[in-house]
Amino acid sequence: MLITVYCVRRDLSEATFSLQVSPDFELRNFKVLCEAESRVPAEEIQIIHMERLLIEDHCSLGSYGLKDGDVVVLLQKDNVGPRAPGRAPNQPRIDFSGIAVPGTSSSRPQHPGQQQQRTPAAQRSHGLASGETVGVPQGLGSPGLIRSMLLSNPHDLSLLKERNPPLAEALLSGSLETFSQVLMAQQREKALREQERLHLYTADPLDREAQAKIEEEIRQQNIEENMNIAIEEAPESFGQVTMLYINCKVNGHPLKAFVDSGAQMTIMSQACAERCNIMRLVDRRWAGVAKGVGTQRIIGRVHLAQIQIEGDFLQCSFSILEDQPMDMLLGLDMLRRHQCSIDLKKNVLVIGTTGTQTYFLPEGELPLCSRMVNGKDESSDKEITHSVMDSGRKEH
């Protein structure tokens, strides 16, 4: 019969393999086969079937009710003595989505000199190319050591800031106590998720609720994998683009107008209309409600005004909105009227009726309400730089 084994090691790494055995195969011999596949010593193996721990090593698999196609869970025991040199497990890893850190060094003793020698090697051999894991020396369970390692590696620090903002914020706060609290909380949360997942794998395969949870977990894993592939292959898709603004003038007052071909009409804020001295021309019979992502009240409409773009004076009408963060938005009515085209290759707006071109504004010249990098992001980048520099000075 074919038995599928789902293995979970002490460091939370996982493996799945299948074994072809007979029903009268003893449990102790089955553990020996599992040791060869999982690299977990037979004396540390626990086999679970249908939420029941198989204890008697001399009993056959058939006596426990195992049959062809069944799935069992292999768990590695905790709190065991030192291992033989030839049975050292794989190096544990830190998952930056959950920061799962292996157990303390009490279960696997290691000399300080060995730890110092292995730390740089582990960091060099296990990069964060995928943004998921990084190699950590055996027994690295101290929040202080983890904090020092992250602060000394700018690449890992930037990935941590992107993948795990709460832990990155605690790291950059400069408080070891805060970092330890956040780290331990995420460890506990990750352990609870692992326990729930093990419970699902050992549940009744005919249970609809368990199958629905397994389906949801597989879906989340596919989403994470899709995101990681996108980060590797198309990182530009995670960036933000600057909005299209141009310089113009209305009634002699300089403005920055947002070019939006998806907007039906050209609009202006009430505050901007007051600065341009055109509120006296507002026809309040055209009052209403503008609906889009949200809703805003339309005070009225200015039927005819002049807008200056470069050297051209163009006729335009405005709908005046009561509470609008941007001064003016050039909608499709104005763009079609003057046969405007958006040339993204040249980064210009072309006025079709006159042939005039005006460049779109760079991010530094955009209004504050439309800049994609705010002060908080800039300060976070500065904090990372200062933390890395401080860490380097302390080491020297």
From Swiss-Prot:
Enzyme class: hydrolase
GO biological process: cellular response to hydroxyurea; proteasomal protein catabolic process; regulation of DNA stability; regulation of protein stability
Region (Disordered): 82-139, 376-396
KW Hydrolase (keyword) present: yes
PROSITE patterns xref list: UBIQUITIN_2
S-S pairs: none
CDD domains: RP_DDI, Ubl_Ddi1_like
Gene3D superfamilies for this protein: Acid Proteases, Phosphatidylinositol 3-kinase Catalytic Subunit, Chain A, domain 1
Residue ranges occupied by any Ubiquitin-like domain in the UniProt entry: 1-81
GO terms for MF: aspartic-type endopeptidase activity
E.C. number(s) listed in UniProt: 3.4.23.-
Active site: 260
Comp. bias regions, Polar residues: 103-122
Keywords: Aspartyl protease, Hydrolase, Protease
Any Pfam family the entry gives: ubiquitin
InterPro entries reported in the protein's UniProt record: DDI1_N, Peptidase_aspartic_DDI1-type, Peptidase_aspartic_dom_sf, Ubiquitin-like_dom, Ubiquitin-like_domsf
Function text: Probable aspartic protease. Seems to act as a proteasomal shuttle which links the proteasome and replication fork proteins like RTF2. Required, with DDI2, for cellular survival following replication stress. Together or redudantly with DDI2, removes RTF2 from stalled forks to allow cell cycle progression after replication stress and maintains genome integrity.
Family classification: Belongs to the DDI1 family.
Protein known as: Protein DDI1 homolog 1
Species of the source: Macaca fascicularis (Crab-eating macaque)
